[in-house]
Amino acid sequence: QWNIEYVRAPEVWSAYSSSYGDAAYGYHVQVQVAVVDTGIDYTHRDLSGAVTWCVVSLSDGAIFYRGTDLKKCSDQNGHGTHVAGIVAARLNGAGVAGVAPKVTLYAIRVLSASGSGYLSDVARGIVEAVKGPDGIAGTSDDADVISMSLGGPHSDTLYEAVRYAYSYGAVLVAAAGNEGASTPSYPAAYPEVIAVGAIDSSYNVPSWSNRNPDVVAPGVSIYSTLPKNKYGYMSGTSMACPHVSGVAALVQALRLAAGKSRLSPDAMKLVLTTTARDLGPQGYDELYGYGLVDAYSAVQYALSQP
């Protein structure tokens, strides 16, 4: 799993587990990552116990559910389960491990079995994730990190949901898109969101990864979980995005474990871009943004902040 090594997550686990226990792996009672996608196969051996709550919004809100009947959020496509494994696959000696292998996940199913969906459903999913199981935004069960491996055109409804999540302190992370375009798709292009481009294991940005991201992460031939206890390789900025979501979860869990407050979305973006490993031309550039996200440097820097 070169991809987990590249973002230096195992170095966080080994450096901080003796002082902070499970927080070094992303576990904290107040830290949840919402995976806004096609659903999650919560029965997968590598995701056992990871998903605690779910939301479904499909067909422009015609199909809607929020609660703990996780079957309703099962993944008929595979994409969401693959993304979820990159964030949170458990360290159980089998299969794969995620960036934050003890973090809690919320399955927010807004894309159909074909992987497509309505921006209105994505927006609804974001809002429900922020409210969390108790239905009230601004409480400890809100999603702290919202991971969005999806993209499309601008939509006022979508932007309103992004602004809502941001106003409640949710760290929003999104795939830059795979169109080979000069700018990220939406929601990644919104200033409140961290846009993630892809690199391969040779640190090259593939031609399809949209330019001008904030940061990059591994996104080519990533091995992760698939439904029915399977595994497989997938490529795309969809795979890069959850690496960053996992790093953000590690930062928040460790800050809380250290008795500090959560980082605001702006502070998190600053920490992740400042500590990223600069690739390509010095400083920000259109291919790599600020560089490869670095979990170890990000945590170290975040814990040095008040």
Give the positions of each predicted feature:
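Active-site glycine-centered loops adjacent to acidic/histidine catalytic or metal-binding residues
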Residues: D37, G177, G236
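Active-site core segment of subtilase-fold serine proteases
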Residues: W2-T104, L111, D121-A143, S202, ...
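Sec-exported extracytoplasmic/periplasmic mature domains
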Residues: A88-N92, P101, V127-G135, R163-A170, ...
